[in-house]
Amino acid sequence: MTTFYTVMSWLLVFGYWLLIAGVTLRILMKRRAVPSAMAWLLIIYILPLVGIIAYLSLGELHLGKRRAERARTMWPSTARWLNDLKSSHHIFAKENSDVAQALFQLCEKRQGIAGVKGNQLQLLTSTDETLSTLVRDIELARHNIEMVFYIWQPGGHADDVAEALMAAARRGVHCRLLLDSAGSVTFFRSPWPAMMRNAGVDVVEALRVSLLRVFLRRMDLRQHRKVVLIDNYIAYTGSMNLVDPRFFKQNAGVGQWVDLMARMEGPVATTMGIIYSCDWEIETGRRILPPPPDDNVMPFEQESGHTIQVIASGPGFPEDMIHQALLTAVYSAREQLIMTTPYLVPSDDLLHAICTAAYRGVEVSIIVPRHIDSMLVRWASRAFFGELLAAGVKIYQFEGGLLHSKSILVDGQLSLVGTVNLDMRSLWLNFEITLVIDDDGFGSDLARVQEDYIARSRLVDAKRWAHRAYWQRIVERLFYFFSPLL
C-alpha cells in the first residue's frame, strides 16, 4: 500500500510539472510581446494552478469555433464588396497632408481601402447634446438603423433613445441593436430587451458570458465599439456608451463620465457599415452588406468636406492594426502631440515612441483622469509616469469627472477619435473602432476641446513625483509587472 501511494505521489508530481512545462512551452511558442509572455510566466510560477487556469481561459485569443468559422466564411463576400466600392473613385481621397500621409498609406495597405472625402463632421462634447441629436436623427430615419454599444444602461435620456428606436421600428424602419453581454448586463436583466423585440427591434447579445464556455472562448474579449448608422448616410462613433451620466456608476466615486462623440454625414457611413455588417455576421451568422453610397444624397463635391479613414480592430480584422496606426501617428508628429485617454497602460513600443517624440522636441501632452473606476489600472498607469515625465512629457490629471474621451491630435492637422484606450485590451484584444481625420479645421475643434480638458486638470509636477512615497513606488512596480495583461 505504501508503495502504491508513493507511486501515485510521484505520478501527481510528474503530472503537475509536466502541465507547467507544457503551458510554459505553449506561451513561449506563441508569437506575443515579451512583457506579456513574462507576465504570464510569472503568474504561473507564483500561483501555478490559478495561473494555468487563468492562462487557458484568458491568455490566448479564442473567438470561439462558431464565430471563427463565420469570420472565415464572410471574408470572400466582404472582399468582393470592398472591390466593388473601389469603383466609386470619386469618394476616395487621392492626396493627404504631409503629417497624415504615412498613416493613410498604412491604413490603405493594411485594410484595402483608402480614406473617403466629402464628409460633414460634427464634434459632440455634451452627453445631453449627443443623445438629443441622436434621438432627432432616429425620428427622421426612413430605412435602417444599426447600433452597437459596449454599455447600454437604462435610465434618463438613454430611455429617450430606446423609445425613439422602438417608435422607428413600429413605423417600418429596420432597427438592429448589438450590445456586449458583459458591458450591458444591466440592460439585459431589465424589461427593455423584451419591449424592444416586441416593437420590432432586432436585439442581439454579443459575446455572451458563460462559465460553461470559459475554455472555449476568452471571456474578457469584448465588443467595445460604439457606433450608430442611419440610412447609410449618418454615422456616430466615439467614446460614449449609451448611458446618461446622471444615472451611471454614481457610487464609483469618480464623478460623471466625460465623453467625446463624432457625428458624420457622407460616404464614411458606408465604410463604417461594412464593419458593422462583419460584427453582425460574426455574432448572428446573418449577412447584411450595406448598399453602395448614394450619389444623390452624398455631399461628395463640397469643398468643406472632411477626409476620414476608419480603422477597425479585433478578431477577424487586420492584426496589430490599431497599434501600428498609433505608432505611425506618434512618429509623424513634428511640433505637437496631445493625447487623451482614461486608461494609460501603453505597450513598450508605444511608450518609447511617445518618449522619443518628446526627446526630439515635440511638445507632448497626455491628459488622463485623476480618478478612474479601476484600482488595478490606476496603479499600473502611475508606473509609467516617471519615464514619461523624465522625457519631458506633460501629464495632466483631469479633475472634472472621469475623462473617458479617447483622442489624439498631431500638429493640429491629424486627429484620431474613437473607442481605443491606450491599454493592452484596446490595442490587441477588443473589437474597437477609430476615426482618422486629415483636416486642420477639425483639428482646431478638437484642440479647443483638449484645451478645455487641460483647463480643468492639474499638471503633474516632475520634481514632486520623483519624491513620492516609497511604498507607492513598490505598489506601482508590482502592478507594472502585470500591465501587459490589463
From Swiss-Prot:
Its main location: membrane. It is found in: Cell inner membrane. One of its GO terms (molecular function) is cardiolipin synthase activity. One of its GO terms (cellular component) is plasma membrane. Keywords: Cell inner membrane, Cell membrane, Lipid biosynthesis, Lipid metabolism, Membrane, Phospholipid biosynthesis, Phospholipid metabolism, Repeat, Transferase, Transmembrane, Transmembrane helix. The active site is at 224, 226, 231, 404, 406, 411. It is an enzyme of class 2 (transferase). PROSITE patterns: PLD. The chain crosses the membrane at residues 3-23, 38-58. Residues 219-246, 399-426 form the PLD phosphodiesterase domain. InterPro entries: Cardiolipin_synthase (IPR022924), CL_synthase_A (IPR030840), CLS_N (IPR027379), PLD-like_dom (IPR025202), PLipase_D/transphosphatidylase (IPR001736). Catalyzes the reversible phosphatidyl group transfer from one phosphatidylglycerol molecule to another to form cardiolipin (CL) (diphosphatidylglycerol) and glycerol. This is Cardiolipin synthase A.
